[in-house]
Every structure is written in structure tokens, then in C-alpha cells.
């Protein structure tokens, strides 16, 4: 049968109440321990989705990558796949990820990167933590309203026209 473990370590991975998901706060030792469970198996997939603490500043990148590298080291030869993405807040971070993965694999740590051509598993909606309108000034002005009130406001042709003239702030 199939076996795998995936961890989400992103500030976008939060519960509906805004709390971080449990794995996003896991330490290297815990993730390496989970990865060690694959020891002796002929199969198994390990994956990590991380923003490398980008919203907290670029200086956090190395420490976050170290956590994932420790996980890969504990995986007994099973490669750790890391999602590679480019975000507006640090557009060249993908280069840092590739450089670290190359150094790790040169030392025998099995790491890979994968690129999603589109957002997979992203739930969008006005009640979700992330949606296409959240960075626009017009939407931000009504964000505090109930869902029904927001839907009514957004149905107004004048609101639509105004929103279409705006530029969203960077939200991811």
C-alpha cells in the first residue's frame, strides 16, 4: 500500500480561527522522527510545503530550511519533496531554495523540488482565510460585514466597477 507524510509549514496554513496548524510549528527533531518511520520501507513519500517564514522576514529562511533538511536526513533514503513557489514578497527566494537543495543532495541528503502549475487544494471563498478579493481596498472596506452584507455589496454594479479599477496589495 501507499505510505506518505506531508507537512504544511506556511503562515497561510491556519485553522478557521486563525491558529497555526500543528505541523507548522513542529520542530526539526519531531519531523525527523516522523521521517524515520520510513526506515526499512521500499516505498514512501515525504513532502513539505513551506513559505520558509518569508512573511516574518528573509533572515528566517536558513533556519526553516535547516528544519526541512533534518527531516530529509531522518528519512532513511526516501526523498523529501519541497514545493517550489515564487511569491511577490520575496521573488527570488526560489533561487535560494534550489541552491540549498543542490547543496543537500551533493551531501547525499535526498531532497527534490516540485512546482505546481496552479494552486492545488486551495479553498477559495468569502468565508475562507484566502480569496481573490482580500487585497483590494474596496473589499477591505466591507470585510467586517456579514457574509450576506458582503455579497449584497459586491453585487452592486458600482462596487464591481470600482473594484475593477483597483490594484490589490500583495497578499501571498
Where are these regions (language model features)?
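Hydrophobic, small-residue-rich alpha-helical packing segments that form membrane-like cores
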Residues: 2-66, 70-71
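Polyanionic/metal-chelating signatures
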Residues: 20, 38, 65, 69-78, ...
Amino acid at each position: 500500500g501507499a505510505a506518505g507524510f506531508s507537512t504544511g509549514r506556511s503562515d497561510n496554513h491556519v485553522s478557521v480561527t486563525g491558529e497555526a496548524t500543528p505541523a507548522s510549528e513542529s520542530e526539526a527533531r519531531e519531523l525527523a522522527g516522523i521521517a524515520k518511520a520510513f526506515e526499512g520501507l521500499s516505498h514512501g513519500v515525504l513532502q513539505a510545503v513551506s513559505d520558509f517564514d518569508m512573511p516574518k522576514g528573509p533572515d528566517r529562511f536558513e533556519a526553516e530550511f535547516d528544519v526541512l533538511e533534518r527531516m530529509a536526513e531522518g528519512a532513511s533514503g526516501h526523498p523529501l519533496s519541497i514545493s517550489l513557489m515564487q511569491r511577490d514578497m520575496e521573488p527570488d527566494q526560489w533561487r535560494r531554495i534550489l541552491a540549498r537543495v543542490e547543496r543537500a543532495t551533493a551531501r547525499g541528503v535526498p531532497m527534490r523540488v516540485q512546482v505546481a502549475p496552479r494552486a492545488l487544494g486551495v479553498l477559495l471563498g468569502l468565508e475562507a482565510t484566502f480569496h481573490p478579493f482580500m487585497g483590494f481596498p474596496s473589499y477591505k472596506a466591507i470585510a467586517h460585514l456579514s457574509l450576506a452584507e458582503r455579497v449584497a455589496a459586491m453585487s452592486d454594479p458600482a462596487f464591481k466597477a470600482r473594484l475593477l479599477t483597483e490594484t490589490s496589495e500583495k497578499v501571498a
